[in-house]
Regions:
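ABC transporter nucleotide-binding domains
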Residues: 2-5, 10-202, 206-208
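Beta-strand-connecting loop/turn residues
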Residues: 1, 14, 250-251, 275
């Protein structure tokens, strides 16, 4: 396991930011750490990067304990914090060369990460002259300098425009082919675009830890059906497993079933038996956003 967290609790006074959290992340794997604001995402990442100590519990990164092997952990981790600390008066290349010296990394690696993160046309500028998106790239380049086995990225796509989003997503996906990438976000589309697996945290506790495909299993199913005339909601509730019915427009109904079995054939048979004509019949896939709301509301 590249990351192993066991029974981590972090308390600030009387408030528990994390409550008995356990999970693991393999290599290579891209895992999205998803949760609403204040759920404990950044706190967990600061513990994994040794910037915070847990109140109780244990965590390991590449086999090194965050509690007493901080230097070994830091050598194996590339960290992009949520609020990316940069020296705005330094030039991009100068800043990266300075940090390369800290890591005892050859200067040639600086040019590699500049090219890898798309910073070549901006490398001659001061960081203060860069847009928010390019500053994020500088932070990511810095995290990659020492070629770490584990990347911990806190809200890595914050402030990026649509074109920059595509570039950074592609970069993170390519890095995830041979590294462990653990990234936090509250944007569902980011998880669906980049991640193999999702861990959802709410109020300091893990509420889901599954592959995206598995997360959708066991959820409700919604069928959209249009008839040629109005049908009473109570009548449609006679369908097996029907949980709720909503008349969304004219003769179009949204029927929610408490099963993952495809219910379209049942709706068709029900309509046929009751001499109802169907004009359209579709299955509405549950979005990660709706599942997120369900798990964190």
């Amino acid at each position: 396991m590249s990351i192993k967290v066991k029974n981590i609790t972090k308390q600030f006074g009387s408030q528990k930011a994390l409550n008995n959290v356990s999970f693991s992340v393999n290599r290579p794997e891209i895992v999205g750490f998803l949760g609403p604001n204040g759920a404990g995402k950044s706190t967990m990442m600061k513990i994994l990067t040794t910037y915070l100590s847990p109140t109780s519990g244990n965590a390991e990164v590449n086999g090194h304990a965050v509690s007493n092997q901080q230097k070994q952990v830091q050598k194996s981790v590339g960290y992009l914090p949520e609020h990316n600390p940069l020296y705005l008066d330094q030039y991009v290349r100068e800043y990266l060369r300075f940090n390369a010296n800290v890591y005892n990394v050859d200067k040639s690696r600086v040019e590699e990460v500049i090219e890898l993160t798309g910073l070549t046309p901006e490398a001659h500028k001061t960081i203060g002259q860069l847009s928010k998106g390019y500053r994020q790239r500088v932070g990511l380049a810095n995290a990659l300098l020492h070629n770490p086995e584990v990347l911990i990225l806190d809200e890595p796509t914050t402030g990026l425009d649509p074109n920059q989003l595509v570039d950074i997503r592609q970069l993170i996906k390519s890095l995830g082919k041979d590294k462990t990438v653990f990234l936090s976000t509250h944007i569902m589309q980011e998880v669906e675009a980049m991640c193999d697996r999702v861990i959802i945290i709410n109020k300091g506790e893990i509420v889901a830890d599954k592959k995206l495909s598995e997360l959708r299993e066991g959820q409700e199913q919604t069928v959209i059906v249009e008839f040629d005339y109005r049908v009473e909601d109570a009548f449609l509730l006679k369908l097996p497993h029907a949980k709720s019915v909503k008349n969304v427009h004219d003769f179009i109904y949204e029927i929610v079933f408490d099963t993952t079995t495809d219910m379209r054939a049942h709706v068709f048979d029900f309509a046929h038996d009751n001499e109802l004509k169907i004009l359209q019949l579709n299955q509405k896939n549950a979005s990660l956003e709706s599942l997120f709301r369900e798990l964190t509301s």
